[in-house]
Amino acid sequence: MRRLFLSHVLGAWLLLSQLPRELSGQKPDDVIKACGRELARLRIEICGSLSWKKTVLRLEEPGLEAGQPVEIVSSSISKDAEALNTKLGLNSNLPKEQKATLSERQPSWRELLQQPALKDSNLNLEEFEETILKTQSEVEDDSLSELKNLGLDKHSRKKRMIQLSHKCCYWGCTRKELARQC
């Protein structure tokens, strides 16, 4: 009788030990302050735990269930691609190489000047080129400043890790933020 009881207790213990372990009883949004070795151990614990990764993915995408297809390409991009394919389909007598170059080609300034909006304007070539160059430089300046503000300009992964470790040490960070770096 005693052997039977011990074998049942041993069986129950083995079954319970196979269940996923709880992660320190902390929620993913609890703020943790950790520096140096503590932070490294915490990252290893979070990144090494398969159940944590599944939990984070489930928390980040609550509307998705297993088995539901996900649309990766946004609808505006797919609409543009459909329009391009339709235009290329109209020129079906062109060889494949010319179709590829036609889809990748940018219109020249002469073609742009032939459009109705620019035909009526009094822009000469120099003014037109200056306008385009000015617009391009403004866009480049804006994108570069945005990248610098985000910390993604050069060596982005290293800089983000430095910023995250600094933040975790002085102000604290969540498990979810640490899991994103895995």
Curated annotation (Swiss-Prot):
The modification Pyrrolidone carboxylic acid is found at residues 26, 163. It holds the Pfam family Insulin. One of its GO terms (cellular component) is extracellular region. Residues 54-156, 161-162 form a propeptide. Residues 1-25 form the signal peptide. Heterodimer of a B chain and an A chain linked by two disulfide bonds. This is Prorelaxin. The lineage of its organism: Eukaryota, Metazoa, Chordata, Craniata, Vertebrata.
